[in-house]
A protein has these predicted regions:
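C-terminal amphipathic alpha-helical interaction region
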Residues: 293-295
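Short, basic/hydrophobic alpha-helical segments
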Residues: 332-338
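Metal-cofactor-binding active-site regions of metalloenzymes
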Residues: 2-289, 341-343, 347-359, 363-471
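Divalent-cation-assisted or electrostatically stabilized phosphate/pyrophosphate-binding catalytic cores
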Residues: 323-329
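Hard-cation-handling environments
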Residues: 299, 304
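Short glycine/proline- and charge-enriched loop/turn segments
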Residues: 308-316
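Metal/cofactor-centered catalytic core regions of large enzymes
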Residues: 270, 316-319
Length: 471
């Protein structure tokens, strides 16, 4: 029987161990998509308790606490940090097979030096150790980033954001990790939302463009894209129900926008037409500017209306949506390809059943750059051992796994960089298994290039950041 999470955790063969320890283990981290707060990086926040780090905004953990029958006051309510931590610790032993069990222990080992198991009985010991360590200067936000080997971070930012914290970080020569904005214009696209008109007023104000029709909206967006570019941005991200394609005449789009500006209801057909026009416009702009387009789709959000009214969005009440017409995604990309206007694109579906359809669609539009159109890493409800293995296996079956740009945290926590270790161990186990099974030669030079590429180097080349590859 193997020891729990020893140095060869998840490494099932001798080749897997060699690939991980020789090539993957010490590679830097390029975190090209996350939700951490740049203000906390600039201010070099020091957390008071492990609860603030772990449970302050982690809806992954909140879902499992609720699944374990924990009262909401210990999840998002007004109970003390110590009480919330106890509730989480008592939930942990039930999470056999869940990545949260692995991630939590990886974090305890890497950042706090704790080698035991977290449960209700050890909660006091772990609480005291973690809180003591968090007071050390080595445990500030910036030091956590540095000791994790991170070279660059892309946050997630709205077009109306001032990006003041990114500017301050860039001007601070005491911190050499690049922290760049990423453009997330969902609020400018969601014409069906009752908040759309108020958001358009905000966008008009910050852009200096009075938005009255689609042409002026495009002008306002271009104004803000130019500002984001001046701040180092070259990455966008979109959250879509699915990648739709419902083309419409400019006059139709103007009429739909006019309804949204006045707060009038728009039909589902009108919503899809407006969003199609919006996505085609921004995609063409991304291509012209050399930006990368990320699209996350396949999520049905805010399913528990009662809890949404109490807590708002992103609190643990989202699920996988099984409706994603692949034909429309292909038509969307085809519309861009007509005039060679497809930007580098990364497609993430929350539904693992979409792996093969993504794999076949991206193969229809590859050109010019290795892996120009990417299937994104297993995301959210899929970033566990099974999900990561299935995503990479599908990509290998249908495309060039060696060009894959690998893992991202997609997290709000400064301790989540262990997810890269988790991913790299799974990658090396998968590739090592193929080699040991005679499905790929034991060509260590080729394997080194593949593993280092997927862990880091491919993303350096793909995004074009001012970073050096690791040879």
């Amino acid at each position: 029987m193997k020891q729990f999470m020893d140095k060869d955790f998840l490494l099932s063969t001798d080749m897997a161990k060699t690939l991980y320890h020789d090539f993957a283990e010490n590679m830097p981290i390029l975190d090209y998509h996350c939700h951490i707060n740049p203000q906390e990086i600039y201010e070099d926040r020091k957390f008071d308790t492990i609860t603030q780090v772990w449970l302050g905004g982690d809806h992954y953990k909140w879902r499992q606490m609720r699944s374990n029958g924990v009262d909401e006051k210990y999840v998002t309510g007004d109970s003390t940090d110590r009480e919330k931590f106890q509730a989480w610790a008592e939930t942990m032993p039930k999470l056999i097979g869940n990545p949260l069990y692995h991630w939590s222990h990886l974090e305890l080992r890497k950042y706090f030096g704790y080698q035991g198991y977290l449960n209700g009985d050890t909660a006091e010991e772990v609480w005291n150790l973690c809180n003591m360590r968090l007071q050390e200067d080595s445990m500030t936000v910036r030091n956590l980033i540095k000791q994790s080997g991170v070279t660059l971070i892309c946050t997630t930012d709205d077009p109306v954001d001032s990006l003041e914290w990114h500017k301050k970080i860039a001007e601070d020569d005491t911190f050499d990790v690049q922290v760049l904005p990423a453009w997330r214009p969902d609020k400018a696209m969601n014409v069906e939302k009752p908040t759309f008109g108020a958001y358009m007023a905000q966008l008009s104000q910050v852009s200096g463009v009075q938005i009255t029709d689609f042409a002026s909206l495009k002008e306002a967006l271009k104004n803000r894209m130019e500002f984001f570019t001046s701040m180092g941005c070259c990455v966008s991200d979109h959250a879509l129900e699915y990648v739709m394609y419902a083309p419409a005449a400019d006059s139709e789009v103007d009429a739909i926008l006019a309804k949204g500006l006045k707060g009038e209801a728009v039909s589902k057909e009108e919503e899809l037409k407006f969003k199609t026009a919006f996505m085609l416009f921004v995609a063409r702009e991304y291509n012209a500017m050399g930006w990368i387009m990320q699209i996350h789709y396949g999520c049905k959000r805010d399913n528990n209306g009662y809890m949404f009214e109490k807590l708002g969005a992103d609190t643990g009440f989202d699920c996988i949506n099984n409706y994603a017409p692949s034909a429309q995604m292909a038509d969307f990309l085809n519309a861009l390809s007509t005039n060679n206007e497809i930007p580098k694109t990364i497609l993430y579906s929350l539904n693992p059943n979409d792996n093969a359809s993504i794999g076949t669609i991206i193969g229809c539009f590859q050109e010019k750059f290795p892996g120009k159109i990417q299937q994104g890493s297993a995301w959210w409800f899929n970033d566990h051992k099974t999900g990561m293995t299935e995503q990479m296996t599908s990509l290998a079956n249908l495309g060039c796994l060696g060009n894959f740009i690998g893992m991202l945290t997609d997290s709000r926590s400064f301790l989540s960089y262990t997810r890269h270790e988790y991913f790299r161990r799974i990658l090396c186990s998968l590739v090592g298994g193929w080699v040991d099974n005679g499905e790929y030669p034991a060509d260590m030079k080729a394997l080194e290039e593949i593993v280092k590429g997927i862990c880091y180097n491919n993303s350096v080349k793909y995004f074009g950041f001012k970073l050096d590859e690791v040879k």
